Amino acid sequence: MDASGVDRRYGVIEIGPGIGVLTRELAKRAAKVVSIEVDERLPPLLAETMAGVDNFKLVLQDVLKVDLKALIAQEFPGMPVAVCANLPYYITSPIVMKLLGDRLPIESLTVMVQKEAADRLAAAPGTRASSAISCAVSYYATSKMMFTAAPGSFYPAPKVTSAVVRMEIRPTPAVQVEDCLLYTSPSPRDISGS
């Protein structure tokens, strides 16, 4: 929670609230929380956890299909905005790239992901852990691994170690390029792993 840097000035977009344990804590700190959840089974549990919380709204939709610029303009006028997310490994890159590549008016993106994905998100260009996603993240933001969480920190315990990465969005990209999609897209070598 502290890793997000959120306080009462902030509007927060939360991706993947689950049953709302983190959501409730975010709502205590932020001016408003809008959570985006794709799993249609979770709203009843989330409603129970968030009962009595008036600065919370749920959007039941796939985050990759949400018009986030419109959502931010409608829900957070005049507020700084932070994104907090607990992302499954298989969808980490598409979501991070949507959030960064769409140049949304957000100040930061704080994600909990599988440790291996966190290593790549936070890797400095040219290091052993760097990859196409590392390059893209460093183009749009500065990133820092905040902490790791052992499987026993959760119930039920996953089979992997997780980590939190905070990305602070750059006001302008790190370098000027004519085609940022070409610059931030993986090369054939990155895709094949050779």
Stretches with model-predicted labels:
Residues 183-194:
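Single conserved hydrophobic/aromatic residue that forms the stacking wall/gate
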